[in-house]
Amino acid sequence: MNHVISDYVKRRLDFKGLKHDKSKIEATKSRVIRAFENLPLEILNLFLDGSRNLSIKIIPDPKLPFGMRTITERSSKELVYTLNICDEAQGWAEDHFLGAVLRQLGHITAELPPDDEWPKERGARARFKESIECKADALVWSWGLRHYDMIYLSETYPSHWVDKIVNDISMMMLTMGKDQ
C-alpha cells in the first residue's frame, strides 16, 4: 500500500515555480506521503480511487503567508481541490506540518464547497468558515489523529482560541455521535 500512496502523492505534488534543494523537496514529499499513510483506509480510498480530485502545489510565500489552504472549484462533473502549501510551511516541525495537511484532507473529505458558494454576508460567511474548520478538525479527531490536529492548532492560534476551538470540536463530535 505504501508504494500506491507514494505514487499517488508524486503524481499530484507540484513544486513548479520554486527553486529548492533536492533534500527539501524529498522531505516535503515524505511528509505528505506520511499524512496519507495515517488516514483510515476508507478515507484514503476516496483519494486513491479518484472520488476526491486533488492536486497539491507548493507555492511561493505571498506577502502574508497562510501556511496551507484548500481551494475548491466546481467543474461540470465534480469538485476539484487544490491544496496550496506556502513555501514557509515546508520549514515547520513535522507534526505541525502533518496536522495542517490532515486538516486540509478533512476539508476535502467533507467536500469543502467553492468560495463562491459560501454565504455572502460577512457575519454568515465568518460563521460558515468557522463551522467548516470545526468539521475538518472533528474529522481528523474521528480518524484517531487528534494529536496532530492539536499540535497544528497550538502552533497556529493563541491559547484562548485553541480552547474555544477544542470546545467547538468536542460539541460537534457529540452531535456527530463520535467518541473523541
PLM segments and residue spans:
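N-terminal low-structure segments adjacent to metalloprotease catalytic domains
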Residues: 1-8, 109
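A short aromatic-anchored loop/beta-hairpin motif
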Residues: 8-17
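Auxiliary, metal-adjacent structural segments of Zn-dependent hydrolase domains
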Residues: 16-78
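Active-site scaffold of zinc-dependent metalloenzymes
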Residues: 55-95, 105-112
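Post-HEXXH active-site segment of zinc metalloproteases
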Residues: 95, 110-138
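Long, well-structured alpha-helical subdomains associated
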Residues: 145-180
